[in-house]
């Protein structure tokens, strides 16, 4: 309940109070009526599930989306992203990137491969083409979740240029 400063786990409920231990270990007491009047997020579904969801989008520069061509395909095979017969020069580089990203996520030891794994385009925007990475991490503990998620995205950021793609970045007051 953000308005009440309550963001954590309910520790005790009585007729007149609800005691919440926040994630920073502070204790907040709110009335039961506050829970009825305001919205709140119930984390129990995530805690009881087989994974914690990651849904993050990265904007790609439209000017760098194009058919892969022979040279890019050869480079992707040479770097081990694909086998020689898997890709053709007329396939768009973003398509190849999405295919590889899904395969990478499905094989990552921290990703729950029995749950949904999807790398897909969202509605184009002025900031570029948003591509959403949607998957579930097996380790739901906050610190491990954050580190595992960041490790995955740092790798995604690092390999983007290998596919001839560029992440959109808005430059204000300086040259690109």
Task: Report residues per predicted region.
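Long, non-transmembrane cytosolic or organellar matrix-exposed soluble domains/tails
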Residues: 78-176
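Soluble accessory domains appended to multi-pass membrane transport proteins
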Residues: 1-88, 95
């Amino acid at each position: 309940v953000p308005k009440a400063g309550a963001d954590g786990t309910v520790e005790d409920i009585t007729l007149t109070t609800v005691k919440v231990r926040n994630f920073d270990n502070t204790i907040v007491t709110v009335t039961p009526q506050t829970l009825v009047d305001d919205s709140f997020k119930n984390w129990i579904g995530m805690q009881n599930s087989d994974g914690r969801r990651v849904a993050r989008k990265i904007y790609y520069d439209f000017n760098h989306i194009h058919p892969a061509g022979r040279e890019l395909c050869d480079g992707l095979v040479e770097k081990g992203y694909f086998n020689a017969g898997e890709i053709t020069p007329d396939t768009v580089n973003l398509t190849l990137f999405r295919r590889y990203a899904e395969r990478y996520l499905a094989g990552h030891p921290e990703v729950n491969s029995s749950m949904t794994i999807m790398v897909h385009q969202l509605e184009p925007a002025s900031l570029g083409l948003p591509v959403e990475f949607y998957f579930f991490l097996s380790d739901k503990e906050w610190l491990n979740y954050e580190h595992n998620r960041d490790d995955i995205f740092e790798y995604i950021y690092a390999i983007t240029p290998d596919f001839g793609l560029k992440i959109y970045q808005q430059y204000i007051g300086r040259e690109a």
